[in-house]
Amino acid sequence: MRGLRTACALAVLMDAGIASDLQAQERLYVVNQAGATISIIDQDRLVVDTVLDLRTLGFSPNAKPHHVVVEDDGSFWYVSLIGDGRVLKFDRGNRLVGQVRMETPGLLTLDPEHDSLYVGRSMTAVNPPKALGVIARTPFTLVDEHEIVIPRPHALAVSLDGQWVHTASLSENRIASVETATGRVRLTTIAGAPRSLVQFALSPDGRTMVAGGELSNTLLVFDLTKPPPFTPAREITVEGKPWEPRFSPDGRTLYLTLLTKNAVAEVDVATWTVRRTLDGKLAQPYGMIVRRDGRYAFITNQNTGAVMEGHSGHEMHGMAGMSASDGWLTVLDLTTGAVKTTLMLGNGPTGAGAARAR
C-alpha cells in the first residue's frame, strides 16, 4: 500500500509539473515601453496575471522594453531594453537569469535550429550600428555583432531551417540576408518608392515571408523556397500603415495591424486579397500575436493619438513631444470578427511574445 501511495503521489507531482509547464507555454508577454513594465497575460483565462516592474530589478525608468520572444516550451523568455542597452533573459518563473549589453537593441528572433538569439536595432535610434547582434541563448553571452551594411536594420526573421536570418532597413529598400553557416551577407534591393519594412512574418511551412511597408501602404510577399537575393513575388495595397503581420496556425490567413486605420486586415493567402477589415476598440494597433489554436488575436494598442500627416510611425514612436499613455490589449475573436474583451496594459505598449509564435 505504501508503494502504491508513493506512486500516486509521484504521479500527482508529475501531473502538476506538466500542468505548470503547459501554463508557462500559454502566457502572453507584452512590454510597456514608456512604463518600464511587462504585462504577463494568461491566454486561456484572458486576464493579466502579473505585471513585472523592471525598476524593481535595478533598471532605470527609461529602460524602454521594446520586444519579447519566448522559447517554444516556455522555459525562457527574452526582452530588449532600448534605453538601458540590454537584452534580458528570464526563466518561466519570471526570474532574471542573464543579461547582455548591446547598443539600442530592437526586435528579437529565435533561431529554431541553433542556440542563437538574433537582435536588431531600435527604430527610434538616430544612427544605430549597421550590425546584427548574435547571442548564444544557453550561456547567454554575446557571440558577435555581424556587420550587415544596411542602415537602421529593423524587420527580423530566421528561416525555419536556421540557414538564413533576414533583416530589412527602415530607411532603404534593402534586405540583408545572412547565411548562418558562413556569415556571408546577400543584399536584396527593392526597386521603386520607399517602403519602410516594419516587421517580417513567416508562414507555418516556412516557404513564404511577408512584410508590411508602412510608407508605401503595401504588403510584400517573398518566396523563401529560393535563396536570396529576393524579388517580391507579390505586392498588394493595404491602406493604413501596415505594421505587424501574423499568419494563422494553418497558414491560410494573414492578419496585419494597420497603425493609422485603427484596424486589422484579414488577408486570404490563397488569393492575396483582403477578405475583411476588423475594427473596434483599437487605437494605434501595434504588436500582435495569434493564439496557438487560431481562435483569438491579441493586439497591443498604443493609444497615443493619430500619426501626423507626412510622418512615419517610427518618427512618432517614443520620440520627444510624443506623450505615451496607458494602452490596452484587444482580444479579437477571429471567427466572428468581434472584440472578445480588452485588458488594460501599461504605458506605451509595443511588442508581444508567446511560445511558438513566429
Residue ranges, per PLM feature:
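Positively charged n-region of N-terminal signal peptides that target proteins for export
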Residues: 1-5
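Bacterial N-terminal signal peptides
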Residues: 7-17
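Predominantly soluble domains enriched in secretory-pathway, periplasmic, or organellar proteins
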Residues: 20-358
